[in-house]
Regions:
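Short, polar/acidic, helix-capping and beta-turn segments at strand->helix junctions
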Residues: 2-126
Length: 126
């Protein structure tokens, strides 16, 4: 049985997908980009600010499912420029305890939705 997770505290999906799906005790989030949930505008001031917005969006989705970043077991990070890895990693690290951080991959891709610089998806378990 699956349950669709939605929250007004994260951006409305820009396509035919859910913010997240809970199956049993496992949450599968869709990729989040730096859309501000209230205005629908992209937050692209700089890569650190953009990444923080992505993580705040993800936090809202996790909370809507009754979870926190401590429940995350896997993150997938897609970036348009590998030279931004350090700045993205610095912001990302603020949301996790290093000793219990999830598994993760970071992949440079040619393009992302709305031509953003970073997109992150996660898997979490209660």
């Amino acid at each position: 049985m699956k349950k669709i997770i939605t929250t007004k505290h994260a951006p409305t999906p820009i396509g035919p997908y859910s913010q997240a799906v809970l199956s049993g005790n496992t949450l599968y989030t869709s990729g989040q980009i730096a859309l501000h949930p209230e205005t629908g505008e992209l937050v692209l001031d700089d890569i650190s600010t953009e990444t923080k917005q992505v993580m705040e969006n993800m936090k809202a989705v996790l909370e809507a499912a009754g979870m926190t970043f401590e429940n995350v077991i896997k993150s997938s990070i897609f970036i348009s420029d590998i030279n931004n890895f350090g700045a993205i990693n610095t912001v990302y690290a603020n949301y996790f305890n290093e000793a219990t951080a999830p598994a993760r991959e970071t992949v440079e891709v040619a393009n992302l939705p709305k031509f953003v610089n970073v997109e992150i998806s996660m898997i979490a378990v209660k």
